[in-house]
Structures are given as C-alpha cells and as structure tokens.
C-alpha cells in the first residue's frame, strides 16, 4: 500500500515538472514573439510614419475656412473714395450640423424662411434629400444690415429655449437655431457710380481688375487670402490654426474728383445740346477731355463720352433699347459693344490731331533755327505740293501772315511752307523727340501703340510732309498730344504722364511715392517762352477766342481734321491749351 502511494506521488511530481517546463517554453515563445512584434513595430513606425499619420488624420473631422483679403481702396488726391471693397456675407446652411439635434430643424428653417424670404417647402425638400450636406449657399453677398434680423432672431430663439428648458422635462426641450453660418467675402463698390469710370476701371467676380487703374495696379491692389484650419480629435479636443489674410495696397490718385465732375458735366451737356447735329438721336461718337498739370505730368481729370456705371458695367440701357440689346446678344456683338464702351478714349483710341499739331511744327522750326519768327507768308487759299493742290481752311486765302498770325488764323499754307523749310529728316526727328508714335507709359491699362500710325523717313514724301505740318495724315492718342504740348509750354520738359501719386498699405503707411519723371527736354526755355506768346495770341485774337474763359488769360490752339474718307465731311474737332 505504501509502495502504491509512493508511485502515485512520483507520477504527480513528474507531471508538474513537465507542465512547468512546457509553460516556461510557452512564456519564452510568447516573449520572443512579443519582442519580434515590438521590433517590427519600430521598423514600421520608422519607415511608414508619415503614411500612417496621414491615414489617422483623414479619419479626424476637419473644417477649413478661407479668410478673404480686402482689396485696396482707390482715392482721389484729396482722399475722396473712388473705389472701395466692402464686406458682404453668404448665408450657408450645414444640414449635417443642424440635424445633429433634430430639435434644431424647425426653428432653424423657420428663421431662414422668415428673415431671408426663402421658401419653407424648398428648404424642407433640400434637407430631406441632402441630410449630410455641409455647404449649401442660400443667399449671396448680403450686407450686414441684411443679415442682422437673422442674428437677432438667433439670439431671441436661444433665450426663449433657455427659459423654457429650465422647467421642461428632457423629452420636451426646445431646440435652438443651429447649422447656419455666414461666409465672409468682399465686394467692390464705386460710391460715385460713373465718375472717372475710364480712369478707375472695374473688377470682375474673380477680384481682378478690368481696364483703368484696377487693371494696371491689380497686383498692388490685391492681397493674399488667409485660411483657418480646425479639426476635432477623438477626445473632442478642437485643434485650430489660423493664417491671417494680407490685405491689398491702396492707391492715392492724382485725380481731383471736383475737377473730374466738372469735366464730365460739360462733356455730357455738350452732347445733349448737339444730340442731333451730326446724326439723329445721338451726340458725338466720342468726346474726350484730359486735364493735366504740365509742370509734373499729373492727370487731374480724364473723362470721355459715352460713360458707364462702374457698379453695373454691363448695363447698356442708357444708349440702347431692349430690342437692340437683345439683337446684339443674338448676333454675338454684345461684348464687342461693351468693350468699346469700356475703352478709355483718351488713351486707347487714335485720331488725327489736326491744327493742334501746328504747335509742334512751329516749335520744331524755332528750336532748329529753320524759322526765326520774323518770316512772312502769302496765303492765296492753297498750295501746289508735288501732284496735289492742298487747300487752306480759308479758301479765299489769309493774305500776308507772320509766324504768330499763321498760328492765330490756323493757316495751312504758312504751315506747309514752314514744313518745307524744316524738311523731312528734321520733322521726323522732332516728332520722335515729342514722343509721337511712342507710348507715354501712363499708368493706365489699354494705352494704344501708334508707331505704325506716324510717318518715318521712308514713308514721308513731299505731300506727306506738307499735310503732317498741319496735323493730318498721321494718328496719335490724346495723351500723346497732351504730354507733347505740356513740354512746349512748361519750358521744354517732357514729363511722363501719371495717375497715381502714392501707394499705401492697409494701415495707411506709405509703401511707395510715385514722383514726377522728366524723361527729356524737347525744346529750350527760350523757344517755350516764344510759343507761349504765340498761343496766348491764338486765343486772344485768333481761332481760339471762344475757348477763353472770362477773367483768365490762357493760351491754346484749336484743331479740325477731316476724318477718312475725306468726302464724308465728318470731322474731329479739338482744343489744346493752358
């Protein structure tokens, strides 16, 4: 019996020993496996860390909001706002957020319908069909005054719900307005509507400028959008990063809004007065006016007819009937008509300067010594030049005239004789000196190139020299003539025309001053002084009498050029003076 018990004890002891050994082996295997997994995890983390981080981040809830920049202002020289960007709001509904609490649906949709005039049935249908929508724009570009009733309603509903829920049981709690937010952006506004429209230009929906200062200085006026990033971690912690927007720079222009308004007033008055003079039912095809400081190149006013409303640049109703506009849209000429309206006539269109160019011919003759000012000329009403008999503006002739009298009476014959004395080579040289045929580089978009519209030595023959001497046969822009004439009367200094005097940042600090630039000297002080005397006489005693304002002594020159084809009897009439 004792032996039997000893055998049982021995067997039990052996079993336990074997069990411990096996358990030890299993633990070792598990530890080795765990160690291997740890090593593998280290390698995975090291080699694929960025990839796994991205996967984790994509599972988190994000929001990203664009923070719009504010486009810079444009002011006149005295601080009058000509163009400004104003904050507006888009009404956005986030259905998913609203439906997070079913109790929010009713007050939210009711408030939207009430405050913004939206159809409640349309709202219900959209939410029903798009419960996960997070960005549904209900209204665009509303002012703060237009969204204020909703903001007030939101507070009112929240207050009522808070008061009611104090005593209501959990199953009967009232909901609040939720899931509506206001997306901020800026819209461009022009407080003076059509004032200085050719100078200012306008912006499109992409915030980029079209024509004028808006286009030329587009990069200065535009800033950089900011962005606000946010996401919720698994523990509902909100992480948020904000990159602030950088607002655009503002422009201080050389324009004087008061002078600009006066110029536009009288341009419109002229076209109303002579509405049926050339063609029934309309004024001139174009009328332009530049008021420029000859002593520094600053543009004080630049206006033209027809004009347009900068706040509604596609509106043609002032000039065309609904039927005419519809016809344009049907035959694809609508945008051609708009572009013609938007063009700045003073810098983009060319014309024959006519007798205003006689000032350049006489100044060239005096400066080069080809004429002295003591000459006399006999005008019998015309002059034979090569194979052409070229008439004077007075068919019976002016008789005997000196240089001053030739300018006063605008005698073509006398100017043709001066042109002959000057010669082709010198005439071409001085047209270049006065920058005719070259861009002035005024800081406005759309300046025309006229190099192909003036003569050169190979294209100017005897007849071309004769007609050029009194301003026909070649084309220039108004700004070319204004800059050239300014140098004739200011002592001979050719200033680059400019419309902006200063660029400032969003805090009003000066970023850059735009100083007057003298590019060259066209004539001497002596020649300039003599030309001022001639121009004064042309207004006091000559063809420019009607341009003389009461109480002021001015000098200037009239101009009349026949448009091509000459036999149609259409004319460009002009006056240039100071």
Regions found by a protein language model. Give the residues of each.
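Beta-lactam-recognizing serine transpeptidase/beta-lactamase-like catalytic domain environment
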Residues: 83, 89, 235-242, 287, ...
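Periplasmic/cell-envelope proteins involved in peptidoglycan metabolism and beta-lactam response
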Residues: 1-322, 425-433, 547, 556
